[in-house]
Amino acid sequence: MMVIRPVERSDVSALMQLASKTGGGLTSLPANEATLSARIERAIKTWQGELPKSEQGYVFVLEDSETGTVAGICAIEVAVGLNDPWYNYRVGTLVHASKELNVYNALPTLFLSNDHTGSSELCTLFLDPDWRKEGNGYLLSKSRFMFMAAFRDKFNDKVVAEMRGVIDEHGYSPFWQSLGKRFFSMDFSRADFLCGTGQKAFIAELMPKHPIYTHFLSQEAQDVIGQVHPQTAPARAVLEKEGFRYRNYIDIFDGGPTLECDIDRVRAIRKSRLVEVAEGQPAQGDFPACLVANENYHHFRVVLARTDPATERLILTAAQLDALKCHAGDRVRLVRLCAEEKTA
């Protein structure tokens, strides 16, 4: 059975293996053991209440409960940009016009932005390619909403998610090549590594501070603004069906889109509810997959179960209860895994 649980110190080698499979561009999951160990330690201290809000971040892993294999990782940053500036480009417009010459040009323009400062962030979503099946990707991504719903007071009103931009298998980023490299004088992979290992001072020091006309970029770079890496397209679709939208903010490195949503408008958060759980044999039927989570802050767990999402009393097997660290009579959080398709 696949289970979401909080990260542990012993997971560092498994996270290193996951990091080696990302192909670059996932800034928050660098193949650097010291950085990953520090990330785990920060998550543990967050759960223990030892960090200020500006440093808090939760990390979860997807584990096969039978073998102990760690198949994926996901995380939430509580409030971005309160210690180090959190940069985006806002894609806007500058108008140049002359009535005398009968000239009017509305030019797409990139503006350096810190507009998302203080927002909670969904980040570090990666599922081992060998495990991309049977709803694992949905479980990994949406489990975070169950945690946010259960512990709403820990998070801010807006949630953002930076989507991985277009990068090829050799680490070539058209957006970086046309823009970032001119100011940072380094390859994308180097900048990505520095950022992922916490060495972010260079961003503030070297970033262009003035608006940038996108027409000055190569056509290849212009074409990838706000576009996602092919492997990230499913993750984008998942978030958009939960209510997230692209509001013309992009990543400063690869040009990938930043999606955002008010936390209380996220479908899985808004529609999740608490039900009593009982042990038994679940009823047979054509039921949809649902997310089921306990309400235990320190020992949080999420699994998938096929059940009636409108039930008031959820029947789970002994194995499911054990995976959730629950007992009969406990209350668990339940929501349909995917939004119901509207029929005409």
Curated annotation (Swiss-Prot):
SUPFAM superfamilies: Acyl-CoA N-acyltransferases (Nat) (SSF55729). GO terms for molecular function: arginine N-succinyltransferase activity. It is an enzyme of class 2 (transferase). The active site is at residue 229. Keywords: Acyltransferase, Arginine metabolism, Transferase. It catalyses: succinyl-CoA + L-arginine = N(2)-succinyl-L-arginine + CoA + H(+). Belongs to the arginine N-succinyltransferase family. This is Arginine N-succinyltransferase. It comes from Escherichia coli O139:H28 (strain E24377A / ETEC). The gene is astA.
